[in-house]
Protein backbone atom coordinates (compact mmCIF):
# COMPACT_ATOMS: atom_id res chain seq x y z
CA UNK A 1 0.00 0.00 0.00
CA UNK A 2 1.40 3.35 -1.00
CA UNK A 3 0.86 6.52 0.94
CA UNK A 4 -0.38 9.48 -0.95
CA UNK A 5 0.32 12.94 0.51
CA UNK A 6 -2.94 14.27 -0.89
CA UNK A 7 -5.18 12.58 1.68
CA UNK A 8 -3.44 14.67 4.37
CA UNK A 9 -4.63 17.83 2.73
CA UNK A 10 -8.16 16.47 2.52
CA UNK A 11 -8.12 15.80 6.26
CA UNK A 12 -7.41 19.42 7.12
CA UNK A 13 -10.46 21.07 8.65
CA UNK A 14 -11.22 24.53 7.47
CA UNK A 15 -12.32 26.89 10.22
CA UNK A 16 -15.82 28.23 9.78
CA UNK A 17 -16.53 31.89 10.44
CA UNK A 18 -16.95 32.68 14.11
CA UNK A 19 -15.85 29.20 15.20
CA UNK A 20 -13.13 30.41 17.53
CA UNK A 21 -15.06 33.44 18.79
CA UNK A 22 -18.32 33.64 20.69
CA UNK A 23 -21.25 34.58 18.46
CA UNK A 24 -22.28 38.22 18.86
CA UNK A 25 -25.89 39.29 18.71
CA UNK A 26 -26.82 42.24 16.52
CA UNK A 27 -27.46 44.40 19.60
CA UNK A 28 -24.05 43.56 21.07
CA UNK A 29 -22.31 44.21 17.78
CA UNK A 30 -23.94 47.63 17.36
CA UNK A 31 -23.59 48.75 20.97
CA UNK A 32 -19.95 47.83 21.56
CA UNK A 33 -17.30 50.50 21.20
CA UNK A 34 -14.67 50.38 18.46
CA UNK A 35 -12.04 49.44 21.04
CA UNK A 36 -14.17 46.51 22.27
CA UNK A 37 -14.84 45.44 18.69
CA UNK A 38 -11.14 45.50 17.83
CA UNK A 39 -10.35 43.39 20.91
CA UNK A 40 -13.03 40.92 19.87
CA UNK A 41 -11.71 40.78 16.30
CA UNK A 42 -8.15 39.83 17.36
CA UNK A 43 -7.29 36.36 16.23
CA UNK A 44 -10.02 36.16 13.59
CA UNK A 45 -9.27 35.70 9.93
CA UNK A 46 -9.31 38.64 7.57
CA UNK A 47 -12.57 37.42 6.02
CA UNK A 48 -14.23 37.11 9.44
CA UNK A 49 -13.08 40.60 10.41
CA UNK A 50 -14.40 42.03 7.14
CA UNK A 51 -17.72 40.17 7.52
CA UNK A 52 -18.24 41.34 11.12
CA UNK A 53 -17.31 44.94 10.31
CA UNK A 54 -19.63 44.94 7.31
CA UNK A 55 -22.44 43.49 9.43
CA UNK A 56 -21.85 46.14 12.10
CA UNK A 57 -21.85 48.92 9.47
CA UNK A 58 -25.10 47.59 7.95
CA UNK A 59 -26.79 47.38 11.36
CA UNK A 60 -25.65 50.87 12.33
CA UNK A 61 -26.92 52.27 9.02
CA UNK A 62 -30.29 50.62 9.66
CA UNK A 63 -30.39 52.30 13.06
CA UNK A 64 -29.49 55.68 11.60
CA UNK A 65 -32.15 55.29 8.90
CA UNK A 66 -34.79 54.36 11.49
CA UNK A 67 -33.95 57.33 13.72
CA UNK A 68 -34.00 59.60 10.66
CA UNK A 69 -37.47 58.31 9.72
CA UNK A 70 -38.71 58.90 13.27
CA UNK A 71 -37.23 62.41 13.28
CA UNK A 72 -38.79 63.19 9.89
CA UNK A 73 -42.23 61.96 11.03
CA UNK A 74 -41.95 63.95 14.26
CA UNK A 75 -40.98 67.11 12.36
CA UNK A 76 -43.84 66.57 9.92
CA UNK A 77 -46.33 66.21 12.78
CA UNK A 78 -44.96 69.35 14.46
CA UNK A 79 -45.17 71.34 11.22
CA UNK A 80 -48.73 70.12 10.66
CA UNK A 81 -49.66 71.18 14.21
CA UNK A 82 -48.12 74.62 13.61
CA UNK A 83 -49.93 74.92 10.27
CA UNK A 84 -53.31 74.19 11.91
CA UNK A 85 -52.53 76.63 14.73
CA UNK A 86 -51.56 79.39 12.29
CA UNK A 87 -54.60 78.69 10.12
CA UNK A 88 -56.85 79.11 13.17
CA UNK A 89 -55.08 82.35 14.06
CA UNK A 90 -55.55 83.67 10.49
CA UNK A 91 -59.26 82.83 10.65
CA UNK A 92 -59.57 84.57 14.04
CA UNK A 93 -57.78 87.68 12.73
CA UNK A 94 -60.01 87.69 9.63
CA UNK A 95 -63.10 87.66 11.89
CA UNK A 96 -61.65 90.50 14.00
CA UNK A 97 -60.82 92.45 10.85
CA UNK A 98 -64.35 92.02 9.52
CA UNK A 99 -65.82 93.10 12.85
CA UNK A 100 -63.59 96.18 12.96
CA UNK A 101 -64.54 97.09 9.39
CA UNK A 102 -68.22 96.96 10.35
CA UNK A 103 -67.53 99.11 13.40
CA UNK A 104 -65.51 101.54 11.28
CA UNK A 105 -68.34 101.78 8.72
CA UNK A 106 -70.83 102.50 11.52
CA UNK A 107 -68.57 105.18 13.00
CA UNK A 108 -68.01 106.69 9.55
CA UNK A 109 -71.79 106.90 9.02
CA UNK A 110 -72.24 108.61 12.39
CA UNK A 111 -69.42 111.02 11.58
CA UNK A 112 -70.93 111.91 8.21
CA UNK A 113 -74.34 112.43 9.83
CA UNK A 114 -72.78 114.74 12.41
CA UNK A 115 -70.95 116.67 9.69
CA UNK A 116 -74.17 117.08 7.76
CA UNK A 117 -75.96 118.26 10.89
CA UNK A 118 -73.11 120.67 11.75
CA UNK A 119 -73.26 122.17 8.25
CA UNK A 120 -77.00 122.74 8.52
CA UNK A 121 -76.57 124.35 11.95
CA UNK A 122 -73.75 126.58 10.68
CA UNK A 123 -75.88 127.85 7.78
CA UNK A 124 -78.49 129.37 9.94
CA UNK A 125 -81.16 128.79 12.54
CA UNK A 126 -82.32 125.24 12.82
CA UNK A 127 -85.78 124.70 11.51
CA UNK A 128 -87.55 121.37 11.54
CA UNK A 129 -87.59 121.30 7.75
CA UNK A 130 -83.80 121.63 7.46
CA UNK A 131 -82.84 118.80 9.84
CA UNK A 132 -83.35 115.27 8.61
CA UNK A 133 -85.14 112.90 10.95
CA UNK A 134 -82.34 110.35 10.90
CA UNK A 135 -79.80 113.00 11.85
CA UNK A 136 -81.83 114.05 14.86
CA UNK A 137 -82.25 110.46 16.00
CA UNK A 138 -78.56 109.76 15.59
CA UNK A 139 -77.62 112.88 17.53
CA UNK A 140 -80.10 112.13 20.29
CA UNK A 141 -78.79 108.59 20.64
CA UNK A 142 -75.22 109.84 20.61
CA UNK A 143 -76.05 112.43 23.25
CA UNK A 144 -77.65 109.75 25.44
CA UNK A 145 -74.57 107.55 25.16
CA UNK A 146 -72.14 110.37 25.89
CA UNK A 147 -74.17 111.64 28.85
CA UNK A 148 -74.04 108.23 30.52
CA UNK A 149 -70.31 107.77 30.02
CA UNK A 150 -69.02 111.33 30.66
CA UNK A 151 -70.80 113.69 33.07
CA UNK A 152 -71.74 117.05 31.53
CA UNK A 153 -70.49 120.11 33.33
CA UNK A 154 -72.55 123.28 33.10
CA UNK A 155 -69.69 125.46 34.29
CA UNK A 156 -68.00 125.60 30.91
UniProtKB/Swiss-Prot annotation:
Record carries keyword Cytoplasm: no
Subcellular location: Nucleus
Modification sites for Phosphoserine: 25
Record GO cellular component, one term: nucleoplasm
Tissues expressed in: Highly expressed in heart, skeletal muscle and placenta. Also expressed in erythroid cells.
Keywords: DNA-binding, Isopeptide bond, Nucleus, Phosphoprotein, Repressor, Transcription, Transcription regulation, Ubl conjugation
A molecular function (GO) term: sequence-specific DNA binding
Annotated segments matching region Basic motif: 51-76
Domain bZIP: 51-114
Keyword Transmembrane: no
InterPro entries linked: bZIP, bZIP_Maf, bZIP_sf, TF_DNA-bd_sf, Transcription_factor_Maf_fam
A GO biological process held by the record: regulation of DNA-templated transcription
SUPFAM superfamilies: A DNA-binding domain in eukaryotic transcription factors, Leucine zipper domain
Cross-link (Glycyl lysine isopeptide (Lys-Gly) (interchain with G-Cter in SUMO2)): 130
Leucine-zipper: annotated segments: 79-93
Origin superkingdom: Eukaryota
Complexes and interactors: Homodimer or heterodimer. It can form high affinity heterodimers with members of the CNC-bZIP family such as NFE2, NFE2L1/NRF1, NFE2L2/NRF2 and NFE2L3/NRF3.
Known function: Since they lack a putative transactivation domain, the small Mafs behave as transcriptional repressors when they dimerize among themselves. However, they act as transcriptional activators by dimerizing with other (usually larger) basic-zipper proteins, such as NFE2, NFE2L1/NRF1, NFE2L2/NRF2 and NFE2L3/NRF3, and recruiting them to specific DNA-binding sites. Small Maf proteins heterodimerize with Fos and may act as competitive repressors of the NF-E2 transcription factor.
Family, as annotated: Belongs to the bZIP family. Maf subfamily.
Protein name: Transcription factor MafK
Annotated organism of origin: Mus musculus (Mouse)
